UniProtKB/Swiss-Prot annotation:
Protein name: Putative hydrolase Bcenmc03_4750
Cofactors that this protein relies on: Mg(2+)
One MF term in the entry's GO annotations: metal ion binding
Enzyme nomenclature, EC number: 3.-.-.-
Top EC class of this enzyme: hydrolase
Keyword Magnesium found: yes
Species in which this protein is naturally found: Burkholderia orbicola (strain MC0-3)
Binding positions for Mg(2+) per the UniProt entry: E124, E126, D155
Length: 282
């Protein structure tokens, strides 16, 4: 299934794409795509519904983040060896874990706000993993059983705040609008191998990132198992799993960063595309 949330910010309704790619309304069946709705049992109930029997959503509504009420938004850094090289950092021996504030979450086509005074706002196309069941101390072999599905994430990052100003990465990762998620939550059964997905990103039509999840340092299963040892993962938690090379700070001979008025387009094979315009934060 391709599940989504649509409507004005803060008033999103749950929906599903039908076989023709049209949005059907699910709000008579579930209040949101969150919590227990994301469990295997909850998704099975949705799967049993014939989309053709659901109300058709007219027009072109705003698409919100594909998961509601996200409890934890967990980032993984330097998870592609070639990205670590372009950043001038060693390939990690264990996952680099940081937090993205849930207040950064927005829809896949919402605008990106360039923070006041920022000259180093950067892009990162990433595979997002949505947890579907409470998960603590699971082993790698069973880790994917706890995944509800997958989505596209743009891990927008302000490099001065992330790297140059000391302390943790979190403060450069969590500005408002720095977490576009979606358009769809594609359920686990439709993604047979999360380590075989092409992902890409373009700025103003120029392709900067072109990678595949097979080159991850730590696989999705390894990340879920690892994180479950140091925290309890809950339904609706989102893990964004790192980015392939081609970020702005790695461009040679001189880094390239986002400016107001640009168009960012990104996508992952089978998971949909995002389209954002950049603007100066007010």
């Amino acid at each position: 299934m391709k599940l989504l949330r649509y409507g004005p910010s803060g008033q999103e309704k749950p929906g599903i794409l039908d076989s023709a790619g049209r949005i059907r309304d699910l709000s008579a069946h579930v209040p949101d795509l969150a919590g227990d709705v994301l469990s295997d049992a909850g998704l099975a109930r949705l799967r049993a519904i014939d989309p053709a029997t659901l109300p058709l959503v007219s027009g072109e509504p705003r698409i919100g983040a594909c998961v509601g009420h996200v409890g934890k938004f967990i980032g993984i850094g330097l998870n592609y060896a070639d990205h670590a090289a372009e950043a001038g950092m060693p390939v990690p021996k264990e996952p680099v874990v940081f937090g993205k504030w849930t207040s950064s979450i927005c829809g896949p086509n919402d605008g990106i706000d360039i923070p006041k005074g920022s000259v180093k706002t950067d892009w990162e196309v990433e595979l997002g993993v949505v947890i579907g069941a409470k998960c603590k101390d699971v082993d790698e072999a069973r880790a994917l059983d706890y995944v509800a599905g997958y989505c596209v994430v743009n891990d927008v990052s302000e490099r001065e705040w992330q790297i140059e100003r000391g302390g943790q990465w979190d403060k450069g990762k969590g500005f408002d609008t720095f977490g576009p998620i979606g358009p769809w939550l594609v359920t686990r059964d439709e993604v047979p191998d999360p380590q075989r997905l092409d992902l890409w990103l373009e700025i103003d039509g120029h392709r900067y990132q072109n990678g595949n999840t097979r080159t991850m340092v730590f696989t999705v299963a390894q990340l879920v198992a690892y994180l479950s040892t140091c925290m309890t993962l809950q339904p609706g938690d989102v893990i964004t799993t790192g980015t392939p090379p081609g970020v702005g700070m790695g461009v040679k001979p001189s880094p390239v960063f986002l400016k107001a008025g640009q168009t960012v387009r990104l996508g992952i094979e089978g998971l949909g595309e995002q389209l954002q315009r950049t603007r100066n934060a007010q």
